[in-house]
């Protein structure tokens, strides 16, 4: 199977659409962080104070958070989360592993290709993140 055939197969035989959770083409969002009683901490969306430039996670929602200051000293909270993936045709989704973002995000499983090797057909499949 040549490269053109593989591309045609993937384009026609297996359509995988990815819709992102926080915006159309972005899996990250930024919002102004709340002010914590300790000026060196930012108030995260979880209601707790967090140090600047350190990550914290919500493993139940598969999200990663980060507080940072801009050049004007305003604190922001960056939220990264998994896209919502929809598999169609022969494609499937493999659930993410337990743990922190991005490992907890689902992965697309592209449908197996049948390749002939020494007179036998062998099925190959591969995974893509998101």
From Swiss-Prot:
Instruction: Recite the UniProt keywords alphabetically.
Output: Disulfide bond, Secreted, Signal, Toxin
Q: Which tissues show it?
A: Expressed by the venom gland.
- Under which name does UniProt file this protein? U-scoloptoxin(16)-Er4a
Q: Where in the cell is it found?
A: Secreted
**PTM statement from Swiss-Prot or TrEMBL:** Contains 3 disulfide bonds.
Could you say which protein family the record assigns here?
A: Belongs to the scoloptoxin-16 family.
Q: Name one GO cellular component term.
A: extracellular region
- Primary residence: secreted
- Which molecular-function annotation in GO is an example for this chain? toxin activity
The stretch of residues making up the signal peptide is 1-26
């Amino acid at each position: 199977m040549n490269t053109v055939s593989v591309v045609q197969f993937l384009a026609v035989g297996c359509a995988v659409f990815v819709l992102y959770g926080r915006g159309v083409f972005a899996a990250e969002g930024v919002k102004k962080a709340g002010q914590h009683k300790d000026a060196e901490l930012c108030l995260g969306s979880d209601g707790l104070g967090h140090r600047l430039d350190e990550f914290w996670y919500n493993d139940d929602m598969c999200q990663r958070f980060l507080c940072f200051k801009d050049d004007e000293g305003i604190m922001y909270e960056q939220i990264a989360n998994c896209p919502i993936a929809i598999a169609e045709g022969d494609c499937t989704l493999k659930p993410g592993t337990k743990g922190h973002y991005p490992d907890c995000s689902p992965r697309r499983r592209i449908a197996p290709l049948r390749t002939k090797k020494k007179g036998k057909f062998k099925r190959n499949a591969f995974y893509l993140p998101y």
